[in-house]
Amino acid sequence: MTSSDTQNNKTLAAMKNFAEQYAKRTDTYFCSDLSVTAVVIEGLARHKEELGSPLCPCRHYEDKEAEVKNTFWNCPCVPMRERKECHCMLFLTPDNDFAGDAQDIPMETLEEVKASMA
């Protein structure tokens, strides 16, 4: 394992911890298909490493660096903080048809999805 891999795993673990704690704090849940959750957390970790901030990975940006500075789409984004609306389906309210009952995700699930994306 290279030092880059170690850093990637630390960032992925940090984003996992953030997502789990935020879901519990806001009474939201992960998608019933945890692979959706894993892809979003992996995207947040990648943006955290590349841009220094967990920019929403589910949107298209003309200028990611400008978006990071703007902070509107940094996770948790403004729509999530204000209205519990998560475009990525990472944080779902209990009444959402796609909401599961999990507020935790196994690290193995994240690693499997990350490996399948490589």
UniProtKB/Swiss-Prot annotation:
Positions with a binding annotation for [4Fe-4S] cluster: 56, 75, 77, 86
Co-factor requirement: [4Fe-4S] cluster
Source organism superkingdom: Bacteria
Catalytic activity entry: [thioredoxin]-disulfide + 2 reduced [2Fe-2S]-[ferredoxin] + 2 H(+) = [thioredoxin]-dithiol + 2 oxidized [2Fe-2S]-[ferredoxin]
Cofactor, free-text remark: Binds 1 [4Fe-4S] cluster.
InterPro entries the UniProt entry points to: FTR_bsu (IPR004209), FTR_bsu_Cyanobacter (IPR024707), FTR_bsu_sf (IPR036644)
One family name in Pfam for this protein: FeThRed_B
List of catalytic residues: 58 (nucleophile)
MF GO annotations: 4 iron, 4 sulfur cluster binding; electron transfer activity; ferredoxin-thioredoxin reductase activity; metal ion binding; oxidoreductase activity, acting on iron-sulfur proteins as donors
GO biological process, one term: photosynthesis
Effect of residue 58 to S: Loss of enzyme activity
Keywords, ordered alphabetically: 4Fe-4S, Disulfide bond, Electron transport, Iron, Iron-sulfur, Metal-binding, Oxidoreductase, Redox-active center, Transport
The keyword Iron is assigned to this record: yes
Effect of residue 88 to A: Loss of enzyme activity
Induction per the UniProt record: Dependent on photosynthetic conditions. Expression declines about 80-90% in the darkness. Re-illumination up-regulates the expression to normal levels. In the presence of glucose, expression is down-regulated by about 20%.
Catalytic activity, EC: 1.8.7.2
Disulfide bonds: 58-88
Site (Increases the nucleophilicity of the active site Cys): 87
Keyword Disulfide bond: yes
Stated family: Belongs to the ferredoxin thioredoxin reductase beta subunit family.
Subunit architecture: Heterodimer of subunit A (variable subunit) and subunit B (catalytic subunit). Heterodimeric FTR forms a complex with ferredoxin and thioredoxin.
Function of the protein: Catalytic subunit of the ferredoxin-thioredoxin reductase (FTR), which catalyzes the two-electron reduction of thioredoxins by the electrons provided by reduced ferredoxin.
Protein name per Swiss-Prot or TrEMBL: Ferredoxin-thioredoxin reductase, catalytic chain
Lineage: Bacteria, Bacillati, Cyanobacteriota, Cyanophyceae, Synechococcales
